Amino acid sequence: KKKKKKKKKKKKKKKKKKLKKKKKKIEKKILKKLDEIIKEGLISRKDKILIAFSGGPDSVFLYHFLNLLKNIISIEISIVYINHNLRHDVENDLRFINEFSNSNNVNYYIESVDVKKYAIKNKKSIELSARELRYEAIETIRKKIGYNKIATGHNLDDNVETFIFRLLRGTSVTGLKSIPKTRENIVRPILDFEKSEILSFLKKIEAVWKKP
């Protein structure tokens, strides 16, 4: 029994060491990516960035990532939540957005769109309709508040998924493209981070995000 207890303790110590190493790697990667973003000009001093915010881990990580950047260069950030009128628990989402913005002292905006109506009228899928209306609504708010950029929380897993999806659809090798880091006034600052890295960092800083 004593031997078994010792083995369990050793396993726990090994797990803790691995987690510490992983956390240090993520911290280094974050600092490196912040530096790259500044050098590449993806985000510049005095940029006003509107974050497409759902309350999920990706958008919460994106907020904290840009907040770190805010401490390095002078940028302004706000968050926007789009209600697609497709979920029954929207009230929980709105409550979370309000609590998040208050606890992080960040301005937030909410816009409502009727995805089903748009999909029927334009004979498009719900997914495509939601995407089109979402970007349209975010762009409208961006102009209204005088911001110059929109940031989305696409990560490395999304990028790989998009590439594979296009490959399976039979897209030619020359036509295969992953998600771009920037397109017009839209930037994707966390595109090089894996989902596991995002979750690990959020747990480290004890961040709260909305569960699906």
Language-model features: where?
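A short, basic/flexible loop-to-alpha-helix module at the beginning of a structural domain
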Residues: 23-51
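Glycine-rich phosphate-binding loop signature in dinucleotide/nucleotide-binding domains
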Residues: 44, 140-148
